[in-house]
Amino acid sequence: MNISDNYMPVILDTILADTIVGCDLYIQNFVNGEIRYILYCNGTNTIRSEKIEELQKHKIEMLFIHKEDQNKYLKYVESSLKNIIRDNRINIIEKAQVVYQVAKNIMLDVFSDPRSGIHVYRAKNLVEATIDMIITNKNASLAIINILSFDYYTYSHSVNVAILGLLFSKYLGIKFEELNVLGTGLLFHDIGKTQIESEIINKKEKLNEKEFTRIKMHVELGANILTKVRDIGDVSLFPVRQHHEKCNGKGYPNRLQGDDIHKFGKIASIIDVYDALTTRRSYADAKKPFSALNIMKNEMEGSFDDELFTKFILFLGQRSEK
């Protein structure tokens, strides 16, 4: 194994002066043509401003950590996420990458313990930070969408749906306060799947009728979890309860039609299906955006709100033109 396989880069500007990162930080060097990693700051020590200034003086933009310490680093970054987002030295692509990695890390914890108030609090802070990034960076849409994972896991799908849904909602002109409420609902839209047997969730073949009936229960199971969590309002539950409802009344769990479905539920439905189609599954390759939209338009006719779906196509088209 190459020594580089044990390390991963982290952006220097995500390390704040006079803080304890919690994991060892290394500098990459070349000795006799070979890569070496030299310990620069012990994870239990405070990294002083002089050390950071020294690195900046030598044009060093990346430090390195052991891959096994990624979770520690992401927890550290999470605690200063809003500062990172507002730091003009960090470009939007790097900000998007940091936010996305932190988001996936949080949702892994959420799905392992969905009733934890601490994890919910972390997730809500993440939504606020993501909205902050989207609002303060005009090029956020292109940067963020380009780093979304193409591999389907329930936790990464939840992050994709939340981020893409927030970008689309900003495009629609939805205000900050509503974005916050909507983003929380989108992030937790599949939380009920934590209560479904893993063999059903991870099954590679088509589900039988009994299994499909069981997995449809994730909607109400998710709503039940969140109604018992403090600080999750009723409006945030619309994406959770209604992301499988269809405007033609053929969805579940309540076969709602048209305007009986809340706008946030309609948005969640579009984004949920689009992300599912454009991510790689064990039983299906990821579809290209145009192909996914074509399937949604022609093979799922009547499922989505016509006006919102048209605007979603325009939203994606606007992004691809930049």
Segments the model singles out, each with a brief description of its role:
Residues M1-L148, Y152:
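Non-catalytic interface/linker regions that flank or bridge core catalytic/transmembrane domains
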Residues Q101-K322:
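Histidine- and acidic-residue-rich, metal-dependent catalytic cores
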